[in-house]
Amino acid sequence: MKALILVGGFGTRLRPLTLSKPKPIVEFANKAMILHQIEALCKIGVNEVVLAVNYRPQLMSQYLEPYEKKLGIKISYSHETVPLGTAGPLALARDLLNDGEPFFVLNSDIICDFPFADLLAFHKSHGGEGTIMVTKVEEPSKYGVVVYKEENGQILKFVEKPQVYVGNKINAGVYIFNPTILDRIQPKPTSIEKEIFPAMAADSQLYCMQLEGFWMDVGQPKDFLSGMGLYLNSLKSKQPELLATGNGIIGPVLIDPSSVIEPGCLIGPNVTIGPNCVIQEGTRLVNTTVLEGTTIGKNSWIKSTIIGWNSSIGKWVRMENTSVLGEDVHVSDELYINGGKILPHKSITSSIPEPEIIM
């Protein structure tokens, strides 16, 4: 089987992290976002993944090359010279995808349990051309809502940001299609959600399966941190042995074994610490991601923050309110950062009391 992952654009919503790396290889819970998806696909027998890329494909290729051998999977690249939306990439990759079998399509920003085996079985059971996963949301008026027959999952229509309640299930960004869908799509900028799916629904060829468990589009910092908490809580119930325990840990917390946590720290809940980090004594971390090679000074207090690679945070620093530090950022002692977005290679010597982008 094959799968296409829509890697797409420039990752502007997750800047400044994506100024250093393409978004799919930014680490989410100490693993590149896209590896969460590729590993799940491998488990159900997918043997080739096609990445639809148009931004820094060489970095993606260099990063993922070792994983082809490690995971026993072929990773191919379909290069867009111009952005083709969410459907055009399928037509561009037609020759790679069309082998007579159903294939998966994923948005690269999605984190969930990826129940691909269940999705494949349901798709084969109804005989339609396509199946999309849907997830339940609390405020459907913010989304495009999927309206479908409860008894068999056949999709009737899509309603964009409904002001009157029509349902609470939305497109979760994970699909499986028969190759015949490729006859509907031209290699030009096309929206699969707004152009292709309504046509398939009108032909009674599109079905949906509800996703059980957590789901999040982690393409922007606030959702990245929320998704991290959901993911860690899922690990807590399914693979608790991967999580940190002991004095000073309020789980769930994920810490790379190469990192050093000095005495007197209080870490968690919902914290990930990447490789080769040092968290000095007396530091408090909550709802925070610390990426590889970072040092945090003594007695700092950090909440709802993403700290980029190889950064250094001084002593008695306070950061909060979805602050995001790019790669190689240096923060002096005794500063306050409130919602700051700091570009790579910056030295911060004064506080940022209000949300601000530091160029």
Swiss-Prot record:
Quote the Pfam families the UniProt record gives: GMPPB_C, NTP_transferase
* Active site, renumbered: 161
Q: Name one GO biological process term.
A: protein glycosylation
Pathway involvement of the protein, from the record? Nucleotide-sugar biosynthesis; GDP-alpha-D-mannose biosynthesis; GDP-alpha-D-mannose from alpha-D-mannose 1-phosphate (GTP route): step 1/1
SUPFAM superfamilies in the record = Nucleotide-diphospho-sugar transferases
Q: Where is this region: Hexapeptide repeat domain?
A: 244-359
Q: What are its cofactors?
A: Mg(2+)
The record's domain comment reads: The N-terminal substrate-binding domain adopts a Rossman-like fold and has a binding pocket for GTP or GDP-alpha-D-mannose. Substrate binding is coordinated by an Mg(2+) ion. The C-terminal domain consists of a series of tandem hexapeptide repeats that adopt a beta-helix conformation. The beta-helix forms several protein interaction surfaces involved in assembly of the GMPPA-GMPPB mannose-1-phosphate guanylyltransferase complex.
The name of this protein is Mannose-1-phosphate guanylyltransferase catalytic subunit beta
Q: Which organism is it from?
A: Dictyostelium discoideum (Social amoeba)
Per the UniProt record, the lineage of the source organism begins with: Eukaryota, Amoebozoa, Evosea, Eumycetozoa, Dictyostelia
